[in-house]
Amino acid sequence: MTASVNVIGAGLAGSEAAWQIANQGVKVRLYEMRPQKLTPAHHNENFAELVCTNSLRANRLTNAAGLLKEEMRTFNSIIMESADKHSVPAGGALAVDRETFSKEVTEKLHNHPNVEIINEEIDEIPEGLTVIATGPLTSDALAKDITKFTGSDGLFFFDAAAPILEKSSLDMDKVYLKSRYDKGEAAYLNAPMTKDEFYNFYNELIKAETAELHDFEDDKFFEGCMPIEEIASRGAQTMLYGPLKPVGLEDPRTGKEPFAVVQLRQDNAAGDLYNIVGFQTHLKWGEQKRVFSMIPGLENARFVRYGVMHRNTFLCSPEVMQATYQTKKRLDLFFAGQMTGVEGYVESAASGLYAGLNAARIAQGKDPVIFPEETMMGAMAHYITHASVKNFQPINANFGIVPKLQERIRNKQERNLKISERAIDRIKKFKNLNFD
């Protein structure tokens, strides 16, 4: 008789894990504590809620995130199917309407005959075949039990969400529509700054007052979602080479590159909401209004949501995990998602896909499998389980963790495309060999 699987948490990783398990013909009990109990970062009860940006990053095969998406599509990923269906214009990136996207994921799982949804908080690791995908905001009780199980303290860092503005409140005479280097369709609103405007803004930003941290939080940040004020504290040049870099964003009205540019990205399908790209923040709300209104075109901006900041936790995976996403101590227990040390929406969902498929195999009496290291999913699983225990940090999908090609290709784009083509070939063969 085929065993059933518990999946704890219906975020990106948990939703994907449950979907993959169910599609293998295995019964799933999907536990989600919302809406009975909310986290500091979630705003609704839908599954797979995007709590930071609405962008799933690049969609091209010359980019590691684009390759990861394509690998997931090979396995009929619920996250990728829903993202593709509810995409909004974002140049060469894949961005989604966050409301309709998460609603689609929720409805698909509710309607799957092999999925049972249970709305309750789990405060200790269950017995039996289980995938824990409770994410960076794992409840205190469960986090305590996980720490007891792993025998190691969790590491802490922060994710920070950018403000969302009403497009109708922006001064369209001061901003212009363009994607960097004109890649894809012109999907970003760009607010150009002169040198004086930039330094006036910068000087106010570094003086702005931040919200008080909780006593369990410290000042560790992950580079991928660093607050804008923390970037500014490292110097003006850090901003000019980071989120405010003007390269490839010539102002069509002058034909010249501005001194600095703030980009705004469409946040919903209707196109009436925009978020400020790279402006995740922990500033007090009044300070956000004051300082961000100094950006040209945003003088009278209406904030639909101010930026917020919240704690994240992740395991020391090289010490705790195997490349199958099983734990070393208990082979019927899997972890998936950001708490394993993969960083990013797509990476989290991909780890859920990987863990879910292996949990389904065990439920069917089969051995778990390790994805080929030439694939991005396989490379990430290998990295998080073989990295230095002492210096382990979260990681995004990147070509640096994938084995090199045998042939030497100087052109970076051509090389990346060749790596992606090899990965897609490997993953299709791997799927045909191991999964129905």
From Swiss-Prot:
Residues binding FAD: 9-14
Residue ranges spanning the membrane: these are: none
- Localization per Swiss-Prot or TrEMBL: Cytoplasm
Pfam families xrefs: GIDA (PF01134)
User: Is tRNA processing there in the keyword field?
Assistant: yes
Write the Enzyme Commission number(s) for this entry: 2.1.1.74
GO biological process terms, semicolon-separated: tRNA methylation; tRNA wobble uridine modification
- InterPro entries attached to this UniProt entry: FAD/NAD-bd_sf, MnmG-rel, MnmG_N, TrmFO
Q: Which GO terms describe its cellular component?
A: cytosol
Q: Which UniProt keywords are present, listed alphabetically?
A: Cytoplasm, FAD, Flavoprotein, Methyltransferase, NAD, NADP, Transferase, tRNA processing
Top EC class of this enzyme: transferase
Zinc-finger as a keyword of this entry, yes or no, is no
Q: Name one GO molecular function term.
A: flavin adenine dinucleotide binding
Q: Which catalysed reactions does the entry list for this protein?
A: uridine(54) in tRNA + (6R)-5,10-methylene-5,6,7,8-tetrahydrofolate + NADH + H(+) = 5-methyluridine(54) in tRNA + (6S)-5,6,7,8-tetrahydrofolate + NAD(+); uridine(54) in tRNA + (6R)-5,10-methylene-5,6,7,8-tetrahydrofolate + NADPH + H(+) = 5-methyluridine(54) in tRNA + (6S)-5,6,7,8-tetrahydrofolate + NADP(+)
Q: Which cofactor does it need?
A: FAD
Function recorded in the entry: Catalyzes the folate-dependent formation of 5-methyl-uridine at position 54 (M-5-U54) in all tRNAs.
* PANTHER family listed in its UniProt record: GLUCOSE INHIBITED DIVISION PROTEIN A, METHYLENETETRAHYDROFOLATE--TRNA-(URACIL-5-)-METHYLTRANSFERASE TRMFO
HAMAP family linked: TrmFO
Q: Which family does it belong to?
A: Belongs to the MnmG family. TrmFO subfamily.
Q: What is this protein called?
A: Methylenetetrahydrofolate--tRNA-(uracil-5-)-methyltransferase TrmFO
Q: Which organism is it from?
A: Ligilactobacillus salivarius (strain UCC118) (Lactobacillus salivarius)
